[in-house]
């Protein structure tokens, strides 16, 4: 198994770990103004693309 020849510096370690952050979820508004995830049915009013698709 390969073994590191040199110790990884604190700067390189922290630079690599800075990419581990969580992404902020993208949000959109449905036609009635509720905040939803894009391309999903609104859980509050049951509409998708200005059509009623769920009975809520």
UniProtKB/Swiss-Prot annotation:
Top-level taxonomic group: Bacteria
Record's keyword annotation contains Ribosomal protein: yes
SUPFAM superfamilies given in the database record: Zn-binding ribosomal proteins
Keywords annotated in UniProt: Ribonucleoprotein, Ribosomal protein
Ranges where the record places region Disordered: 1-24
UniProt feature, compositional bias: Basic residues: 1-20
Family: Belongs to the bacterial ribosomal protein bL32 family.
Record's protein name: Large ribosomal subunit protein bL32
Gene: rpmF
């Amino acid at each position: 198994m390969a073994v590191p020849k040199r110790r990884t510096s604190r700067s390189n370690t922290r630079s690599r770990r800075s990419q581990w952050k969580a992404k902020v979820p993208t949000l959109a508004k449905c036609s009635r103004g509720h905040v939803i995830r894009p391309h999903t049915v609104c859980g509050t009013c049951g509409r998708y693309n200005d059509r009623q698709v769920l009975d809520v």
